[in-house]
Amino acid sequence: MFDPETLRTFIAVAETGSFSKAAERLCKTTATISYRIKLLEENTGVALFFRTTRSVTLTAAGEHLLSQARDWLSWLESMPSELQQVNDGVERQVNIVINNLLYNPQAVAQLLAWLNERYPFTQFHISRQIYMGVWDSLLYEGFSLAIGVTGTEALANTFSLDPLGSVQWRFVMAADHPLANVEEPLTEAQLRRFPAVNIEDSARTLTKRVAWRLPGQKEIIVPDMETKIAAHLAGVGIGFLPKSLCQSMIDNQQLVSRVIPTMRPPSPLSLAWRKFGSGKAVEDIVTLFTQRRPEISGFLEIFGNPRS
C-alpha cells in the first residue's frame, strides 16, 4: 500500500496541489498520477484530497498522512544502506561517556562530525560524567566507550584501556584572596577558614571519590569545571584546578598558585572500551585515540603532553 513510488506520488500531489504538476515533477503522465492516488484512497478507505476543476487540496486524513509520509519515504529509501551498514558490523547506537576534565564542546562536535559522515545511520549518545561516574556509565549503564576513565587499570577484565595522560594540578585562589600573600606552605588551620570549591563525583553505583576538603571546612559544590573556575576567580573559595586550565590565569595574575601541606598528585586518565562485541564505529574511535589523530586532539589538550 505504502510503497516508495506511491508515497512519492502522494507527496508530489500534496506539495504541488495538482495532478498535472505532480506528473511533471515525477516525469509521469497525469493519468498515472491520478490512478495511483485513486488506488491509494481505495486501499486506505478514505478520501485524501478534495478535488476541484483547478486544484486538489488535502483532507484532514490527507494532512495526517502527509505528516508521516515524508519520514516513511526517507526511511524506506535509506533502508538498503542502513541494512548494509548493519551487515558490515556497524552499531545501530554508540553511547560515549566523557570525563568532565576532558570535556570540550568543540572536540565533541569535531568527533561527532567525523563519525556522522562515516556512519550516517548510527545513533550517537554523548554523556558527561565526573570522576567515578565515568566508570559507572561503562559498568552499569551500557556505554560502549569512555574518554577519560580514572586510572590506567580496568575495573573489570571485560574492558581494554589506553592511557591518555595525566592531569597536573595547582592549588589556587583569587589574586586578592586573604591567603594569596601568606607565607607558604599554608597550614590546615589557615585553609580551613575558607570554603573549598568542588565538583561532586557523579557515580551512582560505585563509591564516590571525595574531592579535596579538610575536616570541618565549608564546601561549595558546583556542577562543572567552568563554574568551579569562575568561583575561584570570584574569590568564592579555594581548591585544585588542572594546571593547563589555570596556568594562563596564574600568569596574568587573576589567580594565585600556593603550596599546601598535601598537594594533589597527578591524575592518570585512560580511554576504555569493551573487549568483546564492539562494532566498527567504536573500533574507529579507538584508532583515532591510539594513533593520536588530529580529530581527537581537543580532548588531550588538558594533558599538555599526552601519555605523560
Curated annotation (Swiss-Prot):
Gene this protein is translated from: allS
Entries under Gene3D superfamilies matching the protein: 3.40.190.290, Winged helix-like DNA-binding domain superfamily/Winged helix DNA-binding domain
The protein's role, per its UniProt record: Positive regulator essential for the expression of allD operon. Binds to the allD promoter.
Domain HTH lysR-type: 2-59
Family: Belongs to the LysR transcriptional regulatory family.
Biological process annotations from GO: positive regulation of DNA-templated transcription; regulation of DNA-templated transcription
Protein name: HTH-type transcriptional activator AllS
Domain of life according to the entry: Bacteria
Keywords: Activator, DNA-binding, Transcription, Transcription regulation
Segments traversing the membrane: none
Induction field: Induced anaerobically and by nitrogen limitation. Repressed by AllR.
Database matches in Pfam families: HTH_1, LysR_substrate
Regions recorded as binding DNA: 19-38
GO MF: DNA-binding transcription factor activity; sequence-specific DNA binding
NCBIfam families: PRK10094.1
